[in-house]
Amino acid sequence: MIVKEGPASHSPFKLESLLIRLQSLDNNITGLGARFIHLIDAENELSEEHDQILSSILEYGPNWPFGAEEGFKIFSFPRFGTISPWSSKATDIAKVCGLDSVKRIERGIAFTIQLKDLNLEPKKGAIDLLHDRMTELAISELDQASEIFVTLEPKPSSTIDILSDGKNALEVANQELGLALNDEEMEYLLDQFLKLNRNPSDAELMMFAQANSEHCRHKVFNADWVIDGIEKEKSLFDMIKDTYVSSSKNVLSAYKDNAAVIAGDKADWFLPNLNDQEYGRFNDEIHTMMKVETHNHPTAISPYPGAATGSGGEIRDEAATGRGAMPKAGLTGFSVSHLFIPDDEQSWEETIGKPDHIASALEIMIDGPIGGAAYNNEFGRPNILGYFRTFEEKDREEKNTSWGFHKPIMIVGGMGNISDSSVNKNDIPAGSLIIVLGGPAMLIGLGGGSASSLNAGTSNSELDFASVQRDNAELERRAQEVIT
């Protein structure tokens, strides 16, 4: 393994902000430094020429100061057994530059923590702040990092023994996996698998829970409503669709795809020609595609990745509209409870506390907008508008009741273009192969649909944390290039 130090990983502002957060957890910390560090897995020792080429590839970024350079060392790397999107891109660049002996390049961050009392190590809570424990790990010895290049066997799927233990086995899996299945759904699954005379796998239950969650199926909004013994004519979704029913002129697609489409006009597209691999102008009818959705639960648990993946999911839905569309501009919006800004608290802000498993309104508004904007920027779509609102009020009649947005509303949306020939999906013949386009399938963010369907606080904090996806704008950009 070859090790090469890189540039500073944090801007001075970000480094100072991180230091303040660390000091709030451990008052023994006096300073912080951070720089990228590169690990290279090569088949043999590099020649002097190839070593110089590799060093030039790994010289990048602004010339920021490193911060503290002497002190307690912590190294943060992608979890062993995973390959980061940065790694795949850097390795490709090395291959193109003729470094055929380089098998893989991976990047981490070397943190230097200065301490008042050198006999004390930093507290675990402070170290946890330096990495995302879902996608990264922290080590104290650089020699341990060589394990990142070890290929691990995928963990096998397990089965839930309903043939022996019946519904009880499903109830245990429901709790442990955070599936949010109700009794009726568990009875349905039990009946179906007993008919098949086999046990379900954990993967099957996880997939069913997501596809059948309130987040995906909107069972409440599609349900029949009976109020005071009178069955209502329309569901909540029917009422939402009334706007389209009463004013559908120039609407080409609505409530049947990942995003809606309204009619546009003829214009020139600047697109690649698949025949000669060159860009050119193509005159076609260009329609407008639009989408808005929410990402409330993930943003409440972990604001930055919650808001970032909210934008990422909305971009994915736009791209998957019809037979492929092109996202162009985005929006983000936030509704939260009182902010309680330190040294600037307002007279109307009365504290009622908050659940431990969710972020505060201030944390959401510090990290959430940055997550949404950063993802849009990294994908290559400007985030051009949004809104921000705070509201929290005690009920004047019910003394123990308060209203507000402890679980925030986090809105993501956007607009883009789609060609006339791509507005509607074609029928898929039986037996067709399906390509799943994107990153590796890891247990990160799986369970978000079912977790968001639970009442806040009924899940445990680890399941809540695991249910938040992690952003990967670069990989989504690659997928978008395949689509358009």
Where are these regions (language model features)?
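Core nucleic-acid recognition elements
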Residues: 1-484
